[in-house]
């Protein structure tokens, strides 16, 4: 009986959050180990289904860097990263398109639809479809890194129509310049940020392989305000790959996204814990 009561109390704790977030838009960037391990993949799909069943509108943007690297290695194509961004020649772009749009996007859609069988399910898109992600060429610190795109505009009309019809858009980050018809590989974090900003999302959630932003003792910093992050970078608390994520988070907050969350996708149900409990499990960034 005590265990049953405990479960009831957990549901009761979630009620204020469910009420507050009903009908709101969450943009989730899906990547890392959560995309690679079977148990984590299925756990993630169930979590997204639960968000949908309690009335939250979810837009999913996925990465796939490890799968792209594995395919490039199989094809004996060398790959190089410049400050976390893949240098993308024509061959690498073709592989990225094949892996992101042809394989991963459809795998994710089918996995989500299995868990949302009695409602409008997931629908797979890329940034090419209906000019969803219109891009210009991206330069990394002034360096030409090939066919890498920076999102210029988002077709929010299409996304809004889909979520109003209760579909869950699943977006592969391949964008296009419609004037030149040139396709571009887009960093998934950057794509998710632009989509969240242009939708005015309630939340932007990054799934990573770490427990959010850590202090120098290795403990998770549960919340960061926009006026704190520069100091955390300057004193070496935030380093390496977390710097572009925190920069994206601050950009999103300043452009109208209410809160950004950086959580560990290797922990089962981390999204539910972060969204529906007072304590959370990762780092929350806000004004």
Curated annotation (Swiss-Prot):
It is found in: Cytoplasm. It holds the Pfam family AA_kinase. The keyword ATP-binding applies. It is an enzyme of class 2 (transferase). It catalyses: N-acetyl-L-glutamate + ATP = N-acetyl-L-glutamyl 5-phosphate + ADP. Substrate binds at residues 64-65, 86, 185. Keywords: Amino-acid biosynthesis, Arginine biosynthesis, ATP-binding, Cytoplasm, Kinase, Nucleotide-binding, Transferase. Its EC number is 2.7.2.8. InterPro entries: AceGlu_kinase-like_sf, AcgluKinase_fam, ArgB, Asp/Glu/Uridylate_kinase, Glu/AcGlu_kinase, NAGK-C. GO terms for cellular component: cytoplasm. GO terms for biological process: arginine biosynthetic process via ornithine; L-arginine biosynthetic process. The record marks 29, 245 as: Transition state stabilizer. Pathway: Amino-acid biosynthesis; L-arginine biosynthesis; N(2)-acetyl-L-ornithine from L-glutamate: step 2/4. GO terms for molecular function: acetylglutamate kinase activity; ATP binding. Its main location: cytoplasm. Disulfide bonds: none annotated. Catalyzes the ATP-dependent phosphorylation of N-acetyl-L-glutamate. Belongs to the acetylglutamate kinase family. ArgB subfamily. This is Acetylglutamate kinase. It comes from Hydrogenobaculum sp. (strain Y04AAS1). The gene is argB.
């Amino acid at each position: 009986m005590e265990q049953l009561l405990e479960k009831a109390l957990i549901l009761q704790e979630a009620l204020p959050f469910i009420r507050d977030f009903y009908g709101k838009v969450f943009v989730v960037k899906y990547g890392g180990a959560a995309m690679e391990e079977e148990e984590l993949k299925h756990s993630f799909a169930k979590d997204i289904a639960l968000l949908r069943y309690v009335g939250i509108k979810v837009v999913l943007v996925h990465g796939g860097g490890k799968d792209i690297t594995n395919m490039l290695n199989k094809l004996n194509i060398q790959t190089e990263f410049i400050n976390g961004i893949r240098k993308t020649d024509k061959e690498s772009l073709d592989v990225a398109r094949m892996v992101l749009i042809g394989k991963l996007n459809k795998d994710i859609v089918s996995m989500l639809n299995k868990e949302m069988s009695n409602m409008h399910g997931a629908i797979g898109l890329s940034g090419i479809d209906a000019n969803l992600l219109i891009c210009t060429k991206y330069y990394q610190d002034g360096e030409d890194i090939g066919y890498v795109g920076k999102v210029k505009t988002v077709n929010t009309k299409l996304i809004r129509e889909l979520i109003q019809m209760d579909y869950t858009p699943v977006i592969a980050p391949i964008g296009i310049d419609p004037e030149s018809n040139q396709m571009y590989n887009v960093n998934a974090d950057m794509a998710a940020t632009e989509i969240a900003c242009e939708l005015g999302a309630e939340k932007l959630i990054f799934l990573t392989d770490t427990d959010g932003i850590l202090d120098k003792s290795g403990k998770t910093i549960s919340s960061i305000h926009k006026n704190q992050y520069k100091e955390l970078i300057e004193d070496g608390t935030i380093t390496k790959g977390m710097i572009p994520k925190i920069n994206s988070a601050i950009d999103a907050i300043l452009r109208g996204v209410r809160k950004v969350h950086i959580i560990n996708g290797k922990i089962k149900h981390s999204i539910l814990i972060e969204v529906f409990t007072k304590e959370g499990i990762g780092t929350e960034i806000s004004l």
